[in-house]
A protein has these predicted regions:
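Glycine- and acidic/polar-rich repeat regions and solenoidal domains
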Residues: 9, 31-47, 60-332
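P-loop NTPase nucleotide-binding module
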Residues: 57
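Catalytic cores of enzyme domains
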Residues: 54
Length: 332
C-alpha cells in the first residue's frame, strides 16, 4: 500500500482564510518534507492564510507533516539547490525577508489560527509544523504521539510540534509523548507561551528552544522524559514546571537570527545567541540518582524579592513582552 495524494484538505492558493475544519478523520497522505526554506506541505493546512480553526479531528498517517501552518512556494522553494549554495542561516533569513516584502507576512493577513482538541499520530516528520504561518496562533488541547516513530527518513524538522517564528503563539494543555522530540521552537520564539503541557517518553528531548532571543514563557508544564530541555536561546522565563530529566544549555555564536518589534512581524534586528538572560522561578527539579555525577554550577538562576501586595505593579504576576529581546522582563 502506498500513499500518492499530497494532501487531504488544502486550499489550492494562499489567502483563503477563516475556514473551520471540525470532526473529520484525515489520514493517508504523502506531503513532501517541509523545511522552512521551501513550500511547507502537510496533510491539512491553511496554506498561508489567516484565522483557520482546525478542531476535533483525528489526523494520522502522513508521510511528513500532519498539520502544516507553514510557508507557501512564493517565499522560496528548495533554495538549497544550485552550484554555489548559501548556508542555511542565510537562506532562512532571505525567506523571512521575502515573506515580509512580497509574501504578505503580516498579522492582518497570515496566522492567528486555532488548532485544538485534535488527535495527531503516526506522522513521520511532525504532528504540527510551520514557519511564520503559525504566528499569533493558539495550539491547545491536542494529543500528539508516535511522531517519527517508524524512522522512515530523518531530518532537522522532526518533533511533535515544530514551529519557526511562533510570535505571540500560545501552546497550552497539550499531551505530547512517544515522539522523537516533543516541542521544538526554532528561531523567533518571541512573546511565545508554553503552558500546562505534559511531555513524556520523548526520545531526544521534551523541549528544544533554538536560536531564539525571547522573551518567551514556559510555565506549569510537566517534563517527564529522560532529557527535558535543550536550551540554545536566551530571554526565557521558566516558572512552576516539573523537570524530571536533564538539561543542556549552550550558546550559539555562529548564527545570527532576527528579533521583532513587539507583537508584529517587522524585524527589529539580528543577533547571535550569547546565552543567559533566563529566569527560573518556583520549579521542581528531580535528580536522576546517578551517584557518579558531579554537581554542575548553575549561574543563571535569579530570584527577585517579593513585593507586598499593596505595592505590586500592574504587570506583577504576568509576563511583560512589550520590549525588544534584550529588554526582556518577567515578574512572577
Amino acid at each position: 500500500e502506498i500513499s500518492v495524494r499530497p494532501f487531504c484538505f488544502w486550499p489550492e492558493k494562499p489567502g483563503l482564510g477563516y475556514i473551520t475544519v471540525s470532526g473529520f478523520t484525515l489520514r493517508q497522505a504523502a506531503p513532501q518534507w517541509a523545511t522552512p526554506t521551501a513550500f511547507q506541505e502537510g496533510l491539512i493546512g491553511p496554506h498561508w492564510s489567516k484565522g483557520w480553526i482546525i478542531e476535533n479531528n483525528h489526523i494520522y498517517e502522513s508521510k511528513s507533516v500532519g498539520i502544516s501552518l507553514g510557508t507557501p512556494i512564493g517565499t522560496g522553494h528548495a533554495t538549497v539547490r544550485g552550484k554555489h549554495m548559501k548556508g542555511g542561516t542565510q537562506r532562512e533569513q532571505e525567506v523571512i525577508l521575502r515573506a515580509l516584502h512580497t509574501g504578505g507576512w503580516h498579522k492582518d493577513r497570515v496566522g492567528s489560527h486555532i488548532v485544538r482538541n485534535n488527535v495527531i499520530h503516526d506522522c513521520e516528520q511532525a504532528g504540527i509544523a510551520g514557519h511564520m504561518g503559525g504566528a499569533f496562533s493558539q495550539i491547545y488541547g491536542n494529543r500528539i504521539y508516535n511522531i517519527h516513530h517508524k524512522r522512515l527518513r530523518h531530518g532537522a524538522e522532526v518533533a511533535g510540534i515544530k514551529l519557526h517564528a511562533a510570535l505571540d503563539t500560545q501552546i497550552r494543555e497539550n499531551i505530547i509523548y512517544s515522539c522523537y522530540r516533543g516541542l521544538w521552537l526554532d528561531w523567533q520564539a518571541q512573546g511565545t507561551r508554553v503552558s500546562r503541557n505534559v511531555f513524556f517518553d520523548n526520545l531526544s528531548e521534551d523541549l528544544f528552544v533554538e536560536v531564539c532571543h525571547g522573551p518567551y514563557m514556559v510555565d506549569h508544564n510537566l517534563f517527564l522524559s529522560l532529557m527535558n530541555f535543550r536550551n540554545m536561546s536566551q530571554g526565557g522565563a521558566f516558572a512552576h514546571n516539573l523537570f524530571a530529566g536533564r538539561f543542556v544549555v549552550q550558546s550559539e555564536l555562529t548564527r545570527t537570527t532576527p528579533y521583532h518589534f513587539p507583537h508584529e512581524t517587522a524585524v527589529a534586528g539580528y543577533s547571535n545567541i550569547t546565552g543567559g538572560d533566563d529566569r527560573y522561578y518556583n520549579n521542581v527539579f528531580l535528580g536522576d540518582n546517578d551517584p557518579n555525577k558531579e554537581p554542575v554550577p548553575i549561574t543563571f538562576f535569579e530570584h527577585l524579592p517579593l513585593k507586598p501586595r499593596d505595592k505590586a505593579g500592574e504587570n506583577d504576576g504576568k509576563p511583560v513582552m512589550d520590549g525588544v529581546p534584550d529588554d526582556a522582563v518577567c515578574w512572577l
